[in-house]
Amino acid sequence: MCKFDLSKPYCFYFNEISKIPHGSFDEEKIADYVYNFGLESGLKSIRDEFNNIIIYKEASKGYENSAPLLLQAHLDMVCEKNSDSDHDFKKDPLDLYVEDGWLKARGT
């Protein structure tokens, strides 16, 4: 059963990015969010002219000599909506809800 609990960091941040329109070729606002998250967290953050972002996090104490880990993701979202939806992916946040154990976005 899906429990979308905003007290959990992964739910909180997923909810935050769902408020930011970020369709393909419209990634600047989500790139701003991710880049600023890195800076505000005190992490070395790099952004290029294509909105690619690298955020560096030093190893935790005791793991300084371990192999590095890289997580890679894309910032854009495929924008598909139901035929009866008036959702505007350029300006509207996603309206998240849980139904039958699945996290969904209303109208999409």
Predicted regions and their residues:
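N-terminal capping segment at the start of a domain
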Residues: C2-F25
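Generic hydrophobic segment detector
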Residues: Y13-E16, R47, N52, W102-T108
